[in-house]
């Protein structure tokens, strides 16, 4: 924390970072909050990244350039694969059910 003494006799000092002018005394403890501000800014970047993650057309903070829309593509392919698997299972269930019904019908016609 940089402090500039404006007038040592009347003990007036200026904070070089904020530009605040105040009375200065040696018995007052000062705290450098700039590292705290840096951590808060880093946390804000993480929060903004989490908010951007909700939008599928954007990319996250640490990704390589040119990956815009990758979440939309991944979501489409995932939903397509799930739909294909579930649709195949339903068609197989219907086919096996119809085969069983026709087999029972054929056995009844044969008298077995």
From Swiss-Prot:
Alphabetical keyword list: Cell membrane, Membrane, Methanogenesis, Methyltransferase, One-carbon metabolism, Transferase, Translocase, Transmembrane, Transmembrane helix
Localization: Cell membrane
Please give the name of this protein.
Tetrahydromethanopterin S-methyltransferase subunit B
Its pathway? One-carbon metabolism; methanogenesis from CO(2); methyl-coenzyme M from 5,10-methylene-5,6,7,8-tetrahydromethanopterin: step 2/2
Bilayer disposition of the protein? Single-pass membrane protein
Indicate yes or no for the key word Membrane.
Answer: yes
Q: Which reaction does it catalyse?
A: 5-methyl-5,6,7,8-tetrahydromethanopterin + coenzyme M + 2 Na(+)(in) = 5,6,7,8-tetrahydromethanopterin + methyl-coenzyme M + 2 Na(+)(out)
The keyword Cell membrane belongs to this UniProt entry's keyword annotation: yes
Gene source species: Methanopyrus kandleri (strain AV19 / DSM 6324 / JCM 9639 / NBRC 100938)
Similarity comment: family membership: Belongs to the MtrB family.
Known EC number(s)?
A: 7.2.1.4
The major lineage groups are:
Archaea, Methanobacteriati, Methanobacteriota, Methanomada group, Methanopyri
Q: What enzyme class is recorded for this protein?
A: translocase
What job does the chain carry out? Part of a complex that catalyzes the formation of methyl-coenzyme M and tetrahydromethanopterin from coenzyme M and methyl-tetrahydromethanopterin. This is an energy-conserving, sodium-ion translocating step.
Q: Which GO terms describe its biological process?
A: methanogenesis, from carbon dioxide; methylation; one-carbon metabolic process
Q: Which gene encodes it?
A: mtrB
* Pfam families listed in its UniProt record: MtrB
**Superkingdom as given in the UniProt entry:** Archaea
- Subunit note: The complex is composed of 8 subunits; MtrA, MtrB, MtrC, MtrD, MtrE, MtrF, MtrG and MtrH.
User: What terms describe the molecular function in GO for this protein?
Assistant: tetrahydromethanopterin S-methyltransferase activity
Show the GO cellular component annotation of the record. plasma membrane
Q: Where are the transmembrane segments?
A: 80-100
């Amino acid at each position: 924390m940089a402090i500039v003494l404006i007038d040592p006799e009347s003990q007036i000092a200026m904070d070089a970072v904020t530009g605040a002018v105040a009375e200065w005394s040696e018995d007052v403890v000062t705290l450098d909050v700039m590292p705290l501000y840096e951590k808060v800014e880093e946390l804000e970047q993480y929060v903004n990244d989490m908010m951007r993650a909700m939008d599928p057309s954007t990319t996250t903070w640490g990704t390589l350039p040119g990956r815009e829309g990758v979440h939309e593509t991944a979501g489409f392919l995932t939903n397509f694969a799930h739909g294909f698997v579930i649709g195949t299972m339903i068609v197989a269930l219907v086919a096996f059910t119809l085969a069983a019904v026709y087999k029972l019908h054929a056995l009844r016609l044969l008298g077995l």
